[in-house]
């Protein structure tokens, strides 16, 4: 990886901005027998929380129950991350109002008062983050250079974040 180093604050900023821009990742409960599921994320960098809309009878809502260790896997073109934390069911009406949009509404015919609607809240504890520098062109060039010189490609940086 790169010898460049980003500050912890810069890595966190890039992570939260990428989540805000791309939103979709895979959410799952650690140690649960269910597969991770694609979910739309609504991140709050100031509290290190990520909110997800789901049905109250979904595998995730049932597994989260009173709280469960969970992971959210996220990727964009420049940021890859695995965020670990505590997942719980939440019925925060202010968050429902704040994050409600046409895409969310499509899943809940009863609107914001749909009896199946609930929220999941991931209180992020830490994250492993990979920052990819230069995009696809740099990646292809670095792979070619590494194969020719028998070295490792320099495509970015891996960092750990602690949100506690």
Please give the residue ranges for each predicted region.
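N-terminal leader/targeting segments and the immediate start of mature chains
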Residues: 1-24, 156, 160
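Positively charged, polar, low-complexity stretches
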Residues: 14, 32-36, 62
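A short, Trp-centered hydrophobic/proline-enriched beta-strand micro-motif
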Residues: 16-31, 68-72
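Conserved beta-strand in the GNAT
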Residues: 38-41
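Short active-site oxyanion
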Residues: 46-51
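Short His-Asn-centered micro-motif
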Residues: 53-55
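Short, structured beta-strand-loop surface elements
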Residues: 60-126
């Amino acid at each position: 990886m790169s010898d460049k180093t980003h500050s912890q604050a810069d890595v966190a900023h890039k992570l939260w901005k990428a989540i805000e821009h791309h939103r979709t990742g895979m959410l799952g409960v650690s140690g649960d027998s269910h597969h991770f599921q694609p979910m739309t994320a609504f991140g709050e960098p100031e509290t290190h929380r990520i909110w997800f809309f789901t049905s109250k009878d979904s595998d995730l809502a049932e597994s989260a129950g009173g709280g469960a260790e969970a992971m959210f896997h996220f990727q964009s073109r420049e940021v890859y991350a695995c965020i670990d934390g505590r997942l719980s069911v939440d019925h925060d009406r202010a968050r429902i109002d704040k994050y409600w949009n046409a895409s969310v509404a499509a899943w809940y015919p009863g609107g914001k008062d749909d009896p199946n609607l609930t929220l999941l809240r991931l209180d992020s504890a830490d994250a492993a983050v990979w920052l990819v520098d230069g995009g696809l062109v740099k990646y292809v060039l670095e792979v070619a250079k590494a194969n020719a010189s028998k070295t490792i490609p320099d495509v970015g940086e891996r960092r750990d974040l602690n949100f506690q």
